[in-house]
């Protein structure tokens, strides 16, 4: 697996393409604890294994925003990567939902589809992805 490097303008030809899922990423307790420290979100369902075991989740769960922010690496592993870019910027998110908790120690990966490539000028594009 891994991303294929292409010219941004070539990504237009990939609209509607569903890529093979990328590599698995484990959201282990150390990663969850580090995210809790960075965001100062130490809610017990994320960091207290004993207390979280008494909840309907049966153990600690990853922060939804940790799962969301992991998409940068997960998408990089599974889809096209534009060549010769200076930077990529998150423009925003549409219809983000957290449909199920991710228990500590579980693995996640991304299924990516290019939905749209909109040129803004000769050097800037907005690329819209559907990610599940």
Q: What residue spans do the PLM features occupy?
A:
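Core FKBP-type peptidyl-prolyl cis-trans isomerase
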Residues: 65-68, 126
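HotDog/MaoC-like acyl-thioester-processing domains
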Residues: 1-14, 101-132
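A generic structural signal for short beta-strands and their flanking turns/coil linkers
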Residues: 21-23, 31, 41, 85-94, ...
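Catalytic strand-loop segment that frames the active site of acyl-thioester-processing enzymes
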Residues: 2-62
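Predominant activation on well-ordered alpha-helical scaffold segments within soluble catalytic domains
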Residues: 33-36, 68-72
């Amino acid at each position: 697996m891994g991303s294929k490097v292409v010219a941004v303008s070539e990504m237009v030809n990939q609209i509607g393409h569903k890529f093979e899922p990328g590599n698995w990423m484990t959201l282990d307790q150390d990663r969850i604890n580090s995210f809790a420290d960075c965001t100062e979100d130490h809610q017990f369902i994320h960091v207290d294994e004993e207390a979280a075991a008494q909840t309907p989740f049966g153990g600690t769960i990853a922060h939804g925003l940790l799962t969301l922010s992991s998409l940068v690496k997960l998408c990089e592993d599974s889809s096209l990567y534009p060549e010769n870019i200076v930077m990529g910027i998150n423009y925003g998110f549409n219809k983000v939902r957290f449909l199920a908790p991710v228990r500590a120690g579980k693995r996640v990966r991304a299924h990516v589809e290019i939905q749209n490539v909109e040129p803004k000028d000769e050097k800037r594009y907005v690329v819209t992805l559907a990610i599940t």
